[in-house]
From Swiss-Prot:
This is Non-secreted LysM effector LysM17. The gene is LysM17. It comes from the Eukaryota. The LysM (lysin motif) domains are small globular domains involved in binding chitin in eukaryotes. LysM1 contains one LysM domain. Disruption phenotype: Show no significant difference in the expansion rate of lesion diameters in apples fruits. It holds the Pfam family LysM.
Length: 769
């Protein structure tokens, strides 16, 4: 967008979306004092805002810039709470979960802090807008920053936008503080406009200590106070954006599951979200074992119009062997079912198949095996496709066929499976497993069988001839002769042979076919007489003359170990075979590796060492809010205590999943069998920093205040005075200002907390917010 070309026709306002801020700022009062404060507060973030606005904008986003924004109507007043939304000038949604250019996760601008110069007014509150997960700042008594200046009718700016996480090593202001007009704190800092500086200055000035008995100016029953706070379980709402909402949408997160949110168990995932999701986790780590730790990567299944997705036309060719001749293979699909059939889950199952089909199409250009799950209530669908089928669209085709079958039948059995598993090698295995009884472990074990090159059994089978076939390209043995040239590809060096890796179900015959050589040549190049009877998945074998290369990883020049990001199909055995190691060596390399749970229960998308050396910085967890796995954490020097990075605000506890809280789920340290940092005992979430639940206090304050708060839950804000059906909880009158701030932040994001300076007023009555 260039400079304003002059007067032009203004588009008609879109009904139901509040007022439009003019894209050329013609109707925005740049002299309005409130606008000046807004720009001062968030001017440094404004260039980030425009990345989420369709149509872009000018490159210079200083004061007087030209944002393309529709502003939602005042929360719950002029417009229904659940329909407020942000639109661009063409009426399209512009708020997303990910920067469209960098693909980095983002969070919303903290209006409660950025607008503190305005929201110091006790009638100004930042309200959560559930439809687009953003905020509207209610201004004064009768209007909104989304509306107009009541003095002259000209429009005000309202920035409902996002910014990336900004992390600090020691102290960070939490997103949950957004909804808290900190009137008590800011009353003593009225001259300070920049809220972030003011907050940091206040928090830095607090000297805290732990006490076990009474202290002057403090409640006499500290144990009772502690129990009362913990019993409230306020931390279930702490860091609401990171822990108590559904994971990032799949359409925004992309196919790299490293960008998906991570949860420590199915139970935790169930508490966080009730929407359909796609999941990824280590196949070797049982998900239904009681008290088992499983790092589950999840995204909200939200693909739309996936039928328009176009896979790469040369994917099949690019993934095929470059030496073995390829031939078309037509293979039957075995359809199996068990349990009673019902129409109850038809819509959920077909939706699951469509979401997995969309993912399969988008990831079609990859050349690796596919292991993914759909999860929604009792409906679980798992898919496996071997690496030999990668890039050929076979999985997408099978998912579409099964979806059509279920729609035509109008019913679905308790358990269904579609399998292509009579091949000798898992390289060409495929399975789609459906369960409508919530039996996740059964689906996981079925996919494990497919990866092992075997079939998953159910009670009742429909013969393969009664259903469908699929066609794909595979290495052909029929074209191989004794004169085949085994050196079609350049080898590592003159003396090194060309290699391929074993997969489950392989035999020396199938490996020879993949190599494009005869069985006799394969035996000649691989002289170990015990090789064919002990093929281990991951192991390298020779496809040409020469010496088998040394695949043992080496430490880096700066002393760090050779790190490997664990994939969902990896196991210690396969990693050891692929890297000329043993399970015992892998265990020894990772004694100090963050999140290392041992070979029995590896975490997918976690980094591990495959050599000696310093352990690597752990892989990031997109929804982590504390600890070393927070996004954009700077690499720490060797032997740094990683648990000290990105500590929780106000000394709250941080658990091994990078979440903050003040209950036993966050504050109780425990040891795993490995003793590695960032791990915990089975069934526990552990604690990595600020552990324990002792009350933390400062010295007696010079002045104390009485405060009250009101839990509005999920209801719209600002009901008429006297109509609160809420809990009027009293904080002890002698709590210091700092302690009140701590409690307010602990109470969390879904609670609108107002701290009132009580100069003798009756605090037994609810205060209007």
């Amino acid at each position: 967008m260039g400079p304003n070309p002059g007067p032009k026709a203004q588009p008609a306002p879109i009904r139901g979306f509040g007022v439009k801020i003019d894209q050329y700022t013609n109707d925005v009062d740049l002299k309005d004092e409130a606008n000046v404060k807004l720009w001062e507060a968030i001017g440094d973030h404004i260039s980030l805002v425009t990345k989420f606005l369709a149509g872009g904008g000018p490159t210079d986003y200083g004061a007087g810039g030209k944002p393309l924004l529709f502003c939602g109507a005042e929360a719950g007043v002029h417009q229904p709470w659940d329909t407020s939304i942000v639109k661009d000038h063409e009426g399209k949604n512009v708020v997303t979960d990910r920067d469209p250019k960098t693909k980095m996760p983002t969070k919303y601008l903290n209006l409660g802090l950025a607008f503190m110069g305005v929201s110091r007014n006790p009638n100004a509150n930042a309200f959560w807008m559930s439809k687009f997960d953003g905020y509207d700042l209610d201004y004064d008594d009768d209007t909104s920053l989304c509306a107009e200046n009541p003095k002259d009718g000209r429009l005000r700016y309202a920035k409902v936008a996002k910014r990336p996480f900004i992390r600090y090593t020691k102290m960070r202001l939490p997103p949950l503080a957004t909804a808290i007009p900190l009137a008590v704190v800011w009353a003593s800092l009225a001259s300070v406009i920049n809220a972030n500086k003011a907050a940091n200055a206040l928090l830095a000035s607090i000297s805290v200590s732990t006490v076990s008995g009474t202290a002057p100016g403090r409640p006499t029953e500290l144990v009772s106070a502690q129990e009362a706070i913990l019993a409230g379980d306020y931390t279930k709402r702490l860091h609401y954006q990171g822990r108590d909402v559904c994971p990032v949408g799949c359409s925004n997160a992309g196919i790299d599951t490293s960008s998906w949110f991570v949860y420590g168990s199915l139970n935790r995932l169930d508490r966080a979200c009730d929407r359909p999701m796609l999941l990824d986790f280590a196949l070797a780590n049982p998900i239904d074992t009681q008290k088992s730790h499983v790092a589950i990567s999840a995204c909200t299944a939200d693909y739309e119009n996936f039928s328009s997705f176009v896979p790469s036309s040369d994917s099949a060719t690019s993934c095929a062997s470059k030496v073995a001749e390829q031939a078309e293979v037509t293979f039957p699909l075995l359809l199996k079912s068990s349990g009673a059939s019902s129409s109850q889950h038809v819509a959920d199952v077909t939706s699951a198949l469509e979401q997995l089909q969309a993912f399969a199409i988008l990831s079609n250009s990859g050349c690796n095996e596919t292991i993914k799950y759909f999860y929604s209530g009792d409906v679980i669908v798992g898919v496996y496709a071997g690496s030999g089928l990668a890039g050929q669209g076979v999985l997408s085709t099978v998912l579409e066929k099964l979806s059509t079958r279920i729609k035509d039948d109008g019913s679905v059995a308790e358990s269904w499976s579609v399998e292509m598993c009579s091949n000798s090698s898992a390289r060409y295995s495929l399975s789609v497993l459906v369960n409508t009884k919530g039996k996740f472990g059964a689906v996981q074990r079925g996919l494990q069988a497919s990866k092992n090159g075997t079939c998953f059994s159910t009670e009742t089978e429909i013969a393969a001839s009664d259903w469908e076939t699929v066609t794909y390209l595979a290495a052909s043995a029929s074209s191989i002769t004794s004169t085949a040239n085994p050196n079609k590809l350049t080898s590592y060096r003159a003396t090194a042979c060309r290699t391929i890796q074993v997969v489950s179900g392989d035999s020396c015959a199938s490996l020879a076919t993949q190599c494009g050589i005869t069985a006799a040549q394969f035996t000649k190049y691989n002289s170990d007489p015990s090789l064919c009877s002990g093929l281990t998945p991951g192991k390298h074998v020779c496809c040409s003359p020469g010496t088998l290369p040394d695949f043992t990883p080496k430490p880096s020049a700066d002393g760090y170990c050779y790190s490997n990001l664990v994939k969902s199909g990896d196991s210690c055995a396969s990693l050891a075979a692929a890297n000329d190691l043993t399970n015992a060596k892998i265990e020894s390399f990772n004694k100090m590796t963050w999140g290392w749970n041992g070979c029995e229960k590896p975490f997918a998308k976690y980094k591990i060492c495959l050599s000696t050396g310093y352990p690597p910085m752990p892989a990031t967890i997109p929804n982590a809010v504390c600890g070393p796995q927070v996004n954009d954490t700077v690499k720490a020097p060797p032997e740094t205590d990683l648990s000290t990075l990105n500590e929780c605000p106000l000394n709250a506890c941080c658990n091994i999943w990078g979440q903050c809280g003040t209950t036993g789920d966050f504050c109780t340290p425990s040891n795993s069998s490995t003793g590695a940092p960032g791990t915990a005992a089975p069934g526990k979430n552990g604690c990595i920093s600020n552990c324990g639940t002792n009350i933390v206090t400062s010295s007696a304050p010079g002045k104390t205040y009485n405060v009250s708060y009101h839990d509005l839950g999920g209801r719209p804000p600002r009901p008429p005075f006297g109509e609160y059906n809420s809990k009027d909880s009293r904080i002890p009158a002698n709590f210091s200002c700092e302690r009140v701030v701590q409690l307010a932040m602990e109470m969390g994001h879904s609670t609108i907390v107002q701290l009132l300076i009580d100069a003798g007023a009756d605090t037994s009555l609810p205060h209007p917010l």
